[in-house]
Amino acid sequence: MGLGSRLDACLAREVAGGDRPIAAVLAALAEAAAGTGRLLRDGGADAGPDDLDAAVQARFVAALRETPTALLALPEAEAPLALMPDGAIAVALTPLDGRENLAGNQPAGTLFSLRPAAGAPFREPGRIQVAAGFVTYGPRTELAVTWGAGARIFTLDPSGAFRLSREAVAIPPTSTLYAIDAANARFWEAPMRAFVEDCLRGSEGPRGQDFAMGWCASLAVGAQRALCRGGVHILPGETRRGRANGATRLIHEAAPIALVMEAAGGAATDGRDARILDLPTLDLQQRTPLVFGSAEEVACVGKYHDGRRHTGARSPLFGQRGLLRA
């Protein structure tokens, strides 16, 4: 399909036969995302946080009820919501990611994952996903998605239709961009400190080039940036209590991002040597460290964790310094 093609036309042509339930669910998610984009654009973000979350979630749930979705896993729910008893698809959904950004007129997003409903779909590793993607609500509402035929980006047009704006998206293998929440530096493990410190040293450090750092408190927005510009987005495990495995939900967030990244030639790991799509799932609310983006940059982070790049003692960029101590 050529640029400008409607999402529904692409689905009708490429997702046929026994895969029609996938097409129906993706079309419903796109419809709900289009409505969410209009809601946020027209002032819906001014509603109270709880009201906005409820409105967006209700929009997606209503759309999925009309599709062959058997189970719907939502971020705060202890158990999946049963929708259609004989449905073929199980969906994991984060309806509104990065809601806090909206108060400052910054982008937010939605993440989704489709799995076969047979058996125990949310007890299986992410590699069983049949489709996944994320939506970003910013100057444009864009849908990044894969259903097994590479990664594509569709842009919402004024009529309310998603149209193909980028096909066969390919993440550059290397980049000088990295994203990490530096406010949590004191909780990072030593290899992560070493990686960031070497990036901060730029051309004078061991990596021999200057880097740019950015951070946006939305996984969907970070994934969109990595998809379009490359680089590495890092949500590490931390030393503080309860954060050894990070804060990213494996089923709702890490798995769909990983499927899209790999479809575009990128990578997604736990920061060490474990591919996100291979991680065993033990719990619906399971968390994982997450590193994704350009394949070579993701691998570089792993080298610091396995000792191939981490050299132990470092200069005190992240030391205990301040006005009252050296």
UniProtKB/Swiss-Prot annotation:
Pfam families per UniProt: FBPase, FBPase_C
Subcellular location as annotated: Cytoplasm
Enzyme class: hydrolase
A molecular-function term among this protein's GO annotations: fructose 1,6-bisphosphate 1-phosphatase activity
UniProt entry tagged with the keyword Disulfide bond: no
Record-listed E.C. numbers: 3.1.3.11
SUPFAM superfamilies hit by this protein: Carbohydrate phosphatase
InterPro entries listed in its UniProt record: FBPase_C_dom (IPR044015), FBPase_class-1 (IPR000146), FBPase_N (IPR033391), FBPtase (IPR028343)
Pathway: Carbohydrate biosynthesis; gluconeogenesis
Organismal lineage: Bacteria, Pseudomonadati, Pseudomonadota, Alphaproteobacteria, Hyphomicrobiales
Subunit description: Homotetramer.
Catalytic activity: beta-D-fructose 1,6-bisphosphate + H2O = beta-D-fructose 6-phosphate + phosphate
GO BP terms, alphabetized: fructose 1,6-bisphosphate metabolic process; fructose 6-phosphate metabolic process; fructose metabolic process; gluconeogenesis; sucrose biosynthetic process
Gene Ontology CC annotation, any one: cytosol
Family: Belongs to the FBPase class 1 family.
Record-given protein name: Fructose-1,6-bisphosphatase class 1
Major subcellular site: cytoplasm
Keyword line: Carbohydrate metabolism, Cytoplasm, Hydrolase
